[in-house]
Amino acid sequence: MGSEMCIRDRNYNHQAARHAEKLDNAVWTNQFDNVANREAHILTTGPEIWAQTRQTGLDGFICATGTGGTLAGTTRYLKDVSGGQVQCWLADPPGSVLHTYVQTKRERMERTGNGSITEGIGQGRLTSNLQPDIDLIDNSLHIEDEASIAMVFRMLDEEGLYIGASSALNLVAAARMAQKLGRGSKVATIICDGAARYQTRLFSRKWLESKSLLSAIPSHLHRYIVLP
């Protein structure tokens, strides 16, 4: 596609911005702190969820954060349109600090666990996308990798959906939120990734064993572990 690949040995966090500054015709999109991200979800995702749940009602929304734009923008819209009635929660993987931040009423940021098999979600800070709306978040749930990997296989078996671990985490979180809100609760979440990008890991027996996750998958679903 005509792209130039730049390999850097130093910390990667600021490399794209620094590289763009050296070029006359480059734009650094600043994914995590470009608040057009959050705004897009206020204008599109939030209204779409609200419209699709108009007949059934909506009690809760929950998802994990990477940039924070999806959670923040959708939460902002749903809180405004419902008069604050829709509960909005954050789902957090191991290794992220946001669960403790919410649970301690914004007093501490401490990592829960050492890391996760999920990719692109979880944070070590408040992004510019999330910061304006963090006080609208009503609660948070820590979702362990064992539950996420089991949901990957369950959705493939029961629904024919080939989802990634981040989507699986969101589904686990939505189910737990619904249980906590009570019988008949309507909860929305985001299915944000497919398994194709991760299939050489998620469906590899060796990889699952290396992460101590094989036992988390029900034995009748092991038939989907098709790679050595």
Residue spans for each PLM region:
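Active-site/ligand-binding loops adjacent to catalytic centers
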Residues: 10-21, 25, 78-165, 180, ...
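Short, small-residue-biased leader/transition segments that mark boundaries at the very start
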Residues: 1-7
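Short beta-strand segments
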Residues: 30-32, 63-65, 90-92, 188-192
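Short active-site-adjacent structural elements
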Residues: 149-151, 170-180, 196-200
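Nucleotide donor/acceptor-binding cores
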Residues: 184-186
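Short glycine/serine/threonine-rich phosphate/pyrophosphate-binding segments
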Residues: 64-74, 98, 166-174, 198
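Short, well-ordered alpha-helices that flank and scaffold nucleotide-derived cofactor binding pockets
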Residues: 51, 76, 80, 175-179
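Active-site/ligand-binding-proximal alpha/beta "capping" segment
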Residues: 23-68, 73, 77, 130-134, ...
